[in-house]
């Protein structure tokens, strides 16, 4: 279990038939030798229709830690954030001590009526705290357009003979 170093302090007191010297305390540090867990996405891509209201992306640890694990994330892609296509800003995910996963949620996916290409939301992990970054550090979520293409109407001009 990855954990912080631990200390044991031994203090001598109340000697019998002796006198304590100035060195009556000893501190021993137990150095943690376990590797920090690896943090990354459990899958690197997924998709859903515009009618999906939100999508939770799972971030996993390779092992539980006795310390909180943090990881920053940045949001890019072809979809527009700030409520236009979805809501999710750059941020930091905290996975509490003892847990092995956390979620980053793409919220308020907008079911618009525009016929458009599929759009992507790319979430990239960086700067882990109390963990090391794994190779699956980016997740691409594709918002699949569910709108029909507009109907094409064409007109033909007819000239009729007069009688």
Descriptions of predicted regions:
Residues 155-162:
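Conserved small/polar residues in nucleotide/adenosyl-binding loops
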Residues 46-53, 158:
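Short, solvent-exposed loop/linker segments at the N-terminal edge
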